[in-house]
Amino acid sequence: NLFQFKNMIQCAGTRSWTDYVSYGCYCGKGGSGTPVDQLDRCCKVHDDCYGDAEKIPKCKPYYKTYSYDCSEGKLTCKADNDECAAFICNCDRVAAICFAGAPYNDNNFMIDSKTRCNDI
């Protein structure tokens, strides 16, 4: 769920999860257009992953809880997750690791999505 995703982000990286809420075209609610950079691509992949999770019957990625471990920045999804939980956990784990490895451009925080995120 989103609370667990926030914790994964903070486990894997050094930035606060709030730095990603309104970043680029895909970090935060919704998304459109072309990702502005590597970090924004991480968010688009995460959005697409949640979209795939929703194809699993009764799987609600924004609310479903899952089991995972965070130890010294290493994220592991536990084996006791059901199919939906395992899928969402992996979406969040991959995204948190992607966020941690991507450069952060302050100029892409809170951009004007109407002008910068529409494909022409």
Swiss-Prot record:
Its EC number is 3.1.1.4. Its cofactor is Ca(2+). SUPFAM superfamilies: Phospholipase A2, PLA2. Pfam families: Phospholip_A2_1 (PF00068). One of its GO terms (biological process) is arachidonate secretion. Its main location: secreted. GO terms for cellular component: extracellular region. Ca(2+) binds at Y26, G28, G30, D47. It is found in: Secreted. PROSITE patterns: PA2_ASP, PA2_HIS. The keyword Transit peptide does not apply. Keywords: Calcium, Disulfide bond, Hydrolase, Lipid degradation, Lipid metabolism, Metal-binding, Secreted. Disulfide bonds join C11-C70, C25-C117, C27-C43, C42-C98, C49-C91, C59-C84, C77-C89. It catalyses: a 1,2-diacyl-sn-glycero-3-phosphocholine + H2O = a 1-acyl-sn-glycero-3-phosphocholine + a fatty acid + H(+). Signal peptide: none annotated. Expressed by the venom gland. GO terms for molecular function: calcium ion binding; calcium-dependent phospholipase A2 activity; phospholipid binding; signaling receptor binding. The active site is at H46, D92. Binds 1 Ca(2+) ion. It comes from the Eukaryota. PLA2 catalyzes the calcium-dependent hydrolysis of the 2-acyl groups in 3-sn-phosphoglycerides. Belongs to the phospholipase A2 family. Group I subfamily. D49 sub-subfamily. PANTHER family: PHOSPHOLIPASE A2 (PTHR11716:SF94), PHOSPHOLIPASE A2 FAMILY MEMBER (PTHR11716). This is Neutral phospholipase A2 3. It comes from Bungarus fasciatus. The lineage of its organism: Eukaryota, Metazoa, Chordata, Craniata, Vertebrata.
